[in-house]
Amino acid sequence: MAESFTTTNRYFDNKHYPRGFSRHGDFTIKEAQLLERHGYAFNELDLGKREPVTEEEKLFVAVCRGEREPVTEAERVWSKYMTRIKRPKRFHTLSGGKPQVEGAEDYTDSDD
C-alpha cells in the first residue's frame, strides 16, 4: 500500500462523524487511522474523481462497484464506513405509543 492511495489530504467526515472516527466507536483505532490517512483517496476512487493507478487501487474500485468482496484491510474499512453512513439513524423515544393530540377526547361533532 506504499504506492497506492497516496494523498496529502487527511479525510474527515464532519457530517457523520463530527468528533472524528476514533471517538465515535464504530471503528478501531487502526481503522480510524487508516480512514484519516487514506480516506480522501478512497473517496475520490469511489466517486470516480480519480483514476486507479496501481493494481490494488483497481481492485478497490471493483469492490466499490460491488463486483467483488472486500479482501484487503483498506477495502474492508471503506466498505464498513460506507455501510455505517448509509444506514438510517436510530433514535429512541420515551413513550411507546403514537403521539396523541391533547384535547382530542373533548371534541364532539354535534350541532348543539
UniProtKB/Swiss-Prot annotation:
The keyword 4Fe-4S does not apply. GO terms for biological process: chromosome organization; chromosome segregation; single-species biofilm formation. Residues 103-112 have a biased composition (Acidic residues). Keywords: Acetylation. Disruption phenotype: Inactivation of the gene affects Ori macrodomain organization and Ori positioning. It removes constraints on DNA mobility in the Ori macrodomain and allows long-range interaction between Ori and Right macrodomains. The modification N6-acetyllysine is found at residue 15. InterPro entries: DUF413. Transmembrane segments: none annotated. Pfam families: DUF413 (PF04219). Coiled coil: none annotated. GO terms for cellular component: cytosol. Residues 91-112 are annotated as: Disordered. Involved in the organization of the Ori region of the chromosome into a macrodomain (MD). It constrains DNA mobility in the Ori macrodomain and limits long-distance DNA interactions with other chromosomal regions. Is part of a system composed of two elements: MaoP, which can act both in cis and in trans, and a cis-acting target sequence called maoS. MaoP belongs to a group of proteins conserved in Enterobacteria that coevolved with the Dam DNA methylase and that includes SeqA, MukBEF and MatP, which are all involved in the control of chromosome conformation and segregation. Belongs to the MaoP family. This is Macrodomain Ori protein. It comes from Escherichia coli (strain K12). The lineage of its organism: Bacteria, Pseudomonadati, Pseudomonadota, Gammaproteobacteria, Enterobacterales. The gene is maoP.
